[in-house]
C-alpha cells in the first residue's frame, strides 16, 4: 500500500507532468512515468522505477551530458494508477484517503545517486531512512536538510548572496555539515567519500 509522505495532489502531478531530461547534452521532454523498469533496492527487494520531472535546477546548473530522475515505487503501484486513468475511474478524493499516511505502517525512503564519468567510471551513493520517533522517513530526509540549511544561514548570513538559490549553490562546507548532521540523526548515507 502506497502512503503519500507529502501532498497526494503533488504526487499525482508528478505522475502526469512532462519530464525534462538531458540526453547527449540536449534537454528533451518525455512523457511522465515512461521508461518503466525493475530496480533492485538493497534490503527491500524489487521495485519499479519510472521517469519523473524532479531534476529542477540541476538540469541547468550541473554540467552533464545525460541526466535523468526516476521515481521508485512498489511493483504494481504505477500500473494501477495508469489503469484507473485509462478507465476514467481515477478519483482524487479517493486517492487522498487511500494514500493517507499511517504512522503505524513501516515505511522507508531510498535515494540512489549514480554518476558515470566520460571514462565510464561509476560512483554511486545511497541515502536510506526508515523514519523514527522524530518523524517519517521523507520528513526526516527533506526536513533535516532544510533545518540544517536554516542553522547555517542563521550562523552566516553571507553563506550565499541575497536571493533565491538552488541547493547546489551551497558551499562545500555547508554540504559536508548537512551530510554529517544527517548521519548523526540516523540517516544512512553510503558511498565514496568526496573531499569537499
What are these regions (language model features)?
Residues 1-196:
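C-terminal catalytic/substrate-binding lobe primarily of soluble NAD(P)-dependent oxidoreductases
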Amino acid at each position: 500500500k502506497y502512503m503519500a509522505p507529502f501532498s497526494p495532489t503533488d504526487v499525482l502531478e508528478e505522475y502526469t507532468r512532462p519530464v525534462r531530461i538531458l540526453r547527449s547534452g540536449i534537454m528533451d521532454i518525455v512523457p511522465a512515468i515512461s521508461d518503466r523498469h525493475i530496480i533492485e533496492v538493497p534490503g527491500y527487494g524489487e521495485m519499479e522505477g519510472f521517469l519523473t520531472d524532479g531534476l529542477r535546477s540541476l538540469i541547468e546548473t550541473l554540467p552533464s551530458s545525460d541526466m535523468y530522475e526516476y521515481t521508485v515505487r512498489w511493483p504494481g503501484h504505477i500500473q494501477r494508477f495508469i489503469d484507473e486513468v485509462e478507465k476514467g475511474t481515477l478519483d482524487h478524493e479517493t486517492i487522498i484517503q487511500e494514500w493517507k499516511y499511517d504512522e503505524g505502517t513501516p515505511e522507508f525512503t531510498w535515494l540512489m545517486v549514480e554518476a558515470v564519468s566520460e571514462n565510464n567510471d561509476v560512483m554511486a551513493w545511497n541515502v536510506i531512512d526508515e523514519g523514527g520517533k522524530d518523524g517519517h522517513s521523507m520528513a526526516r530526509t527533506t526536513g533535516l536538510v532544510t533545518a540544517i540549511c536554516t542553522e547555517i544561514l542563521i550562523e552566516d548570513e553571507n553563506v550565499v548572496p541575497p536571493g533565491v538559490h538552488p541547493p547546489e549553490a551551497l558551499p562545500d562546507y555547508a554540504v559536508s555539515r548537512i551530510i554529517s548532521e544527517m548521519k548523526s540523526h540516523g540517516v544512512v548515507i553510503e558511498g565514496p567519500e568526496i573531499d569537499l
